Amino acid sequence: DGILFRVINFDGKEYYIDFVDLEMKLADPQTTMMILCNPHNPIGKIWDIESLERIGEMCAKYNFLVISDEIHCDLTAPNKNYIPFASVSKVNQMNSITCIAQLKLLLAGLQTDFIVVANPQLRHKVNRGINTDEVAEPNSFAITATFAAFTKGAVWLDELREYIEEIKI
C-alpha cells in the first residue's frame, strides 16, 4: 500500500513543482519512495538543477528513496538537454535508482533498458531483485543493437527530435 500523489501544477505558462505540498506529503510516514519522471511524461518538462537538488534534499531528509524514471531522456526538444537526477549531487546519487529505456532508438522490445544505482548497498538489493527471475539477461542481438544505436544513432535521434518538435501541438 502507498499513497499516490502529484505535486505538479500549471500556472498557465509553465509547469512547476509545489515544494510546500511535496514536503507535506514526504512527511507522511506511510510512504518511503518517490517516483520522479525526468523529463516529465507527458508534458516533456525538463526539471532544472535547483528543483532536482531540492527534491533530493527533501527526500533524504524524510528517508525517501527516489526512483528516477528517465526513460524519455533522449526525447527532449532540439538543443535542450535533460539533467539526470543522480548527477546533481552526491545526496541524489546515493539515494536514487535511475531507470532508462531505449524506446527512442526503437529498441523497446529488445530488453536493452538500464538501471543505474550508485549506492553499493542499494545496488546489491536491485541486483538480487532483477536476477531472481533472470530478467537482467539481454540476448546477443540486444547487445549489438544497443551498441549500434549509441555509436551510430545520433544523427537519426536529432532528426527525430526535430520532427517531433515540428508536429507538436
What residues fall within each predicted segment?
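Substrate-binding/gating loop at the entrance of the active-site cleft, primarily
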Residues: 1-5
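Aromatic/hydrophobic pocket-lining residues that form π-stacking "cages" and hydrophobic walls in ligand
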Residues: 55, 85, 169
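Residue-level signal for well-ordered alpha-helical positions
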Residues: 78, 88, 128-129
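PLP-dependent aminotransferase class I/II
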Residues: 95-169
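Short, conserved catalytic or adaptor-binding loops enriched in Gly and charged residues
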Residues: 86-92
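Hydrophobic residues at beta-strand termini and immediately following loops
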Residues: 6-8, 99
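Active-site phosphate-binding strand-loop segment of PLP-dependent enzymes
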Residues: 10-80
